[in-house]
């Protein structure tokens, strides 16, 4: 019973870390990466379609992205979708290929992004602590129903706290890595 609760909490904490990493990849650093455009949707024959289904995104170098659109008539729609996204990118088309130069981030913009990243990381920590709280309340209800002893209850709370500490440390490591990426010129 206790092991199931702990295992479930570990799974949920792992998913929280993955969700944090996913949300941080959407924050633009000075480097080009294809996942930067993952959330962009293009109107394709009346339907909203993810950009990666309309064209192929590649990274020719650290400061540029390029998109090869499968249907050449969609180039202007793809450009509009990129401009509408609030990434601050200006696509340039040569008829068959869309190039997106990534302007270097200003110092002020970097600091703003670091604040955003810290907020995301704090949200990840809060999610992990909420999972710990849920597990602890499950342990308390088991104790009230006399399904576990007082000693088992304390051991379970200690082990869930140790697991929580490990995951919070992982959040801190992800945060430090992303901050370093942002402050790199």
From Swiss-Prot:
Q: Where in the cell is it found?
A: Cytoplasm
**What's a Pfam family in this record?**
RRF
State the Gene Ontology terms under molecular function. ribosomal large subunit binding
Q: Which GO terms describe its cellular component?
A: cytosol
Highest taxon in the source lineage: Bacteria
Q: Which UniProt keywords apply?
A: Cytoplasm, Protein biosynthesis
Q: List the disulfide bonds.
A: none
Which GO terms are recorded in the biological process aspect for this UniProt protein?
A: cytoplasmic translational termination
Which coarse location class applies to the principal site listed for this UniProt protein? cytoplasm
The protein's job, in short, is:
Responsible for the release of ribosomes from messenger RNA at the termination of protein biosynthesis. May increase the efficiency of translation by recycling ribosomes from one round of translation to another.
What family is this?
Belongs to the RRF family.
Matching HAMAP family: RRF
Supply the name of the protein. Answer: Ribosome-recycling factor
């Amino acid at each position: 019973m206790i092991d199931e609760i702990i295992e479930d909490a570990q799974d949920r904490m792992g998913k929280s870390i993955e969700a944090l990493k996913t949300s941080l990849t959407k924050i633009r650093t000075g480097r080009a990466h294809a996942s930067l455009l993952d959330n962009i949707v293009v109107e394709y024959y009346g339907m909203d379609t993810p950009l990666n289904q309309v064209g192929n995104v590649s990274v020719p170098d650290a400061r540029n992205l390029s998109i090869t659109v499968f249907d050449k008539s969609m180039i202007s729609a793809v450009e509009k979708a990129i401009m509408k996204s609030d990434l601050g990118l200006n696509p340039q088309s040569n008829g068959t290929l869309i190039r997106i130069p990534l302007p270097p981030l200003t110092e002020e913009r970097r600091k703003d992004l670091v604040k955003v990243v810290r907020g995301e990381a704090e949200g990840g920590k809060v999610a992990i602590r909420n999972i710990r709280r849920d597990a602890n309340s499950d342990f308390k209800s088991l104790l009230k129903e006399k399904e576990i002893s007082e000693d088992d209850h304390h051991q379970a709370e200690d082990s869930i706290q140790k697991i929580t500490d490990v995951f919070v440390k992982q959040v801190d490591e992800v945060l430090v890595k992303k901050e370093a990426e942002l402050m790199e010129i």
